[in-house]
Amino acid sequence: DRDSCVDKSKCAKYGYYYQCDECCKKAGDRAGTCEYFKCKCNP
């Protein structure tokens, strides 16, 4: 789910990141972005 994406994904400080994107899409969201090394999912 969405929280697991945030918890397990390390990413670049800013911008899109492939693993976040994949995880967020599996959680049913449109895309994932990075903010300060954490994934954020965009519904």
Swiss-Prot record:
<dbReference type="GO" id="GO:0019870">
    <property type="term" value="F:potassium channel inhibitor activity"/>
</dbReference>
<dbReference type="GO" id="GO:0090729">
    <property type="term" value="F:toxin activity"/>
</dbReference>
<feature type="disulfide bond">
    <location>
        <begin position="5"/>
        <end position="23"/>
    </location>
</feature>
<keyword id="KW-1015">Disulfide bond</keyword>
<keyword id="KW-0964">Secreted</keyword>
<keyword id="KW-0632">Potassium channel impairing toxin</keyword>
<feature type="disulfide bond">
    <location>
        <begin position="20"/>
        <end position="39"/>
    </location>
</feature>
<keyword id="KW-0528">Neurotoxin</keyword>
<dbReference type="GO" id="GO:0005576">
    <property type="term" value="C:extracellular region"/>
</dbReference>
<comment type="function">
    <text>Reversibly blocks Kv11/ERG potassium channels.</text>
</comment>
<protein>
    <recommendedName>
        <fullName>Potassium channel toxin gamma-KTx 4.4</fullName>
    </recommendedName>
</protein>
<keyword id="KW-0872">Ion channel impairing toxin</keyword>
<feature type="disulfide bond">
    <location>
        <begin position="24"/>
        <end position="41"/>
    </location>
</feature>
<dbReference type="InterPro" id="IPR012622">
    <property type="entry name" value="Ergtoxin"/>
</dbReference>
<feature type="disulfide bond">
    <location>
        <begin position="11"/>
        <end position="34"/>
    </location>
</feature>
<comment type="similarity">
    <text>Belongs to the ergtoxin family. Gamma-KTx 4 subfamily.</text>
</comment>
<keyword id="KW-0960">Knottin</keyword>
<keyword id="KW-1220">Voltage-gated potassium channel impairing toxin</keyword>
<dbReference type="Pfam" id="PF08086">
    <property type="entry name" value="Toxin_17"/>
</dbReference>
<dbReference type="InterPro" id="IPR036574">
    <property type="entry name" value="Scorpion_toxin-like_sf"/>
</dbReference>
<keyword id="KW-0800">Toxin</keyword>
